[in-house]
């Protein structure tokens, strides 16, 4: 599944928990991205890493963020698919509302629009949009589109 997705993609953003084992998983995923870019999808690039479940008060979170930043700075000027990548400025803070929302079949923007989690994802959307469209500014409020629980086709089945 991962390889098929990477073969179809042009750009990848990776969510990363700031933990040691997640860094190991990132290493394995970078190997897979390198393999796909070298064999079947030369257009594939890693645009950034988003730190999730981030707790700024922990030393580990800061160390992982520095390690990721250092890794990407060392890759500048290489031919790696992540040579222009970055650790995104927006960090998705640990927030119970993010964990609760899916159990209600809703996005965090629907379930808890005033929560830290919703705020963080709005900021992330603005940051990613600014990377692709530096001359455009998104409105401060991102509209919430309600999740559709089913379609006429699925109801008829």
Q: At which residue positions do the language-model features occur?
A:
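Conserved catalytic-core segment of NTP-binding enzymes
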Residues: 1-87
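Short, glycine-rich, amphipathic interfacial segments at transmembrane boundaries or analogous
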Residues: 94-102
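C-terminal boundary of histidine-terminating zinc-finger modules
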Residues: 101-123
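C-terminal alpha-helix
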Residues: 123-135
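Conserved beta-strand scaffold positions in the cores of enzyme catalytic domains, especially
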Residues: 87-91, 108
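Long, low-complexity intrinsically disordered regions
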Residues: 138-157
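Active-site donor-binding loop signature of nucleotide-sugar glycosyltransferases
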Residues: 90, 94, 113
């Amino acid at each position: 599944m991962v390889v098929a997705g990477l073969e179809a993609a042009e750009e990848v953003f990776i969510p990363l928990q700031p933990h040691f084992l997640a860094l190991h998983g990132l290493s394995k995923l970078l190997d897979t991205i390198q393999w796909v870019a070298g064999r079947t999808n030369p257009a594939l690039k890693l645009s950034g890493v988003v730190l999730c479940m981030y707790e700024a008060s922990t030393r580990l979170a800061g160390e992982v963020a520095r390690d990721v930043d250092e890794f990407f700075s060392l890759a500048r000027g290489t031919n790696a698919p992540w040579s222009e990548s970055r650790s995104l400025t927006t960090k998705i803070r640990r927030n119970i509302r993010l964990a609760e929302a899916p159990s209600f079949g809703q996005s965090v923007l629907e379930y808890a629009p005033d929560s830290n989690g919703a705020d963080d994802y709005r900021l992330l959307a603005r940051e990613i949009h600014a990377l692709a469209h530096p001359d455009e500014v998104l409105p401060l409020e991102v509209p919430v589109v309600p999740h559709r629980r089913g379609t006429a086709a699925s109801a008829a089945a």
